[in-house]
Amino acid sequence: MRWDALFNDMESQLAEADRLSLEAEIGERTRAELVAIELSDRLRGVLGCTLGVHLLSGESVRGRLAHAGAEALVIDEDWYQVLIPYPAVARYVGLGRLARSEPSVVRRALGLAHSLRALARDRAELSISLGGSTGVTRLEGVIDRVGKDYVDVAAVTPGEARRSRHVGDVSTVPFAALAAIRSRKHAGL
């Protein structure tokens, strides 16, 4: 009987060691998988859901998440779409745990400049929030030109076409200063 008890005890200890080893491996694999998840993947997990976005500038945007790209996201508000570069965001409210990677290589390659070029091509009237240490500054106008890391915004009279006689001035804005770019929904993003 003593031998049976000894072998049963040893068997229980080995089973417990195997269980602990398996739990440790599962924990390690979970941590390794989490390291590979990008913020844009988490955002894609809540596409179509309501999301609150608090910007570093102090401004807040709340609406339906319409797109999560490589460098920016798009929020649908009632009348506007808001393009927000990821570096302008301080925090998100309503972001779930689900993550979805972008399967399209082409979509993964599309960055902020591509979205801004589409707005420039459409001559969309925009309200651009610039973030900084002094708070939010707004520019109203049309994008004239998009460079590698900057955008030229022509201030135009609201409702007027972008013609030289309607342009007040042209501001060159580094991408790093962009906090939010609002366009009317019908203009498309």
Segments and roles (model prediction):
Residues 1-62, 66-189:
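Short glycine-rich, low-complexity segments
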